């Protein structure tokens, strides 16, 4: 039996959906004000009850800015205290394992914004997003970054972070 020579079809290139940021519209008057204020000036302090979308809004506006191609910022840096607000006891593991507990909201937001459950990991690999804790921010200068200070509860941590900002940054403070 002779083998038929089949033409090989060229490989199809799949463009990852993750590079496309979902369009988000403000849902409330307060969110409209936040959108407008950020677009006029690069610094915002957002406060509100739990579940009002502060972190989601900040991350969306930060990604929108970075992906516009007009921003001097190269990445988003999320800074958060990992001191538990309720005593949950000792968390075993190394630094990365301890911090991973606090990453879940950001992973979920990235998955929703990009329509890809692996968006956070891809953004980290591309060095477009970074997570730091207030415990390890000393000695670091946050250059060319949009900084999101999440769960800002301590005045001490806030003043400590202010000395870490470099050139061409935007800051979101979320209470």
Residue spans for each PLM region:
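Conserved P-loop
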Residues: 47, 56-124
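Conserved RecA-like ASCE ATPase "motif II neighborhood" in helicase/translocase motors
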Residues: 127-148, 153
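The conserved Walker
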Residues: 50
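Conserved glycine(s) of the Walker
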Residues: 53
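Interdomain "pre-motor" coupling segment immediately N-terminal to P-loop NTPase/helicase cores
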Residues: 1-13
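N-terminal pre-P-loop "Q-motif" helix
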Residues: 23-40
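Single conserved hydrophobic/aromatic residue that forms the stacking wall/gate
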Residues: 155-175
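Pre-Walker A (Motif I) flank of P-loop NTPase domains
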Residues: 40-45, 144
């Amino acid at each position: 039996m002779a083998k038929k020579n089949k033409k090989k079809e060229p490989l199809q290139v799949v463009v990852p959906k993750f590079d496309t940021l979902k369009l988000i519209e403000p849902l409330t008057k307060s969110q409209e004000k936040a959108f407008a204020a950020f677009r006029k000036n690069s610094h915002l302090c957002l406060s509100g009850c739990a579940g009002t979308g502060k972190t989601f809004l900040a991350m969306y506006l930060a990604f929108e800015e970075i992906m516009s191609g007009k921003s001097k910022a190269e990445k988003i840096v999320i800074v958060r205290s990992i001191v538990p607000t309720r005593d949950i006891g000792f968390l075993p593991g190394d630094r990365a394992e301890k911090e991973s507990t606090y990453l879940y909201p950001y992973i979920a937001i990235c998955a929703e914004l990009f329509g890809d459950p692996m968006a956070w990991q891809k953004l980290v690999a591309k060095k477009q997003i970074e997570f730091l804790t207030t415990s390890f921010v000393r000695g670091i200068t946050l250059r060319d970054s949009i900084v999101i200070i999440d769960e800002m509860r301590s005045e001490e941590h806030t003043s400590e972070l202010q000395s870490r900002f470099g050139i061409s940054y935007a800051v979101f403070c979320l209470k």
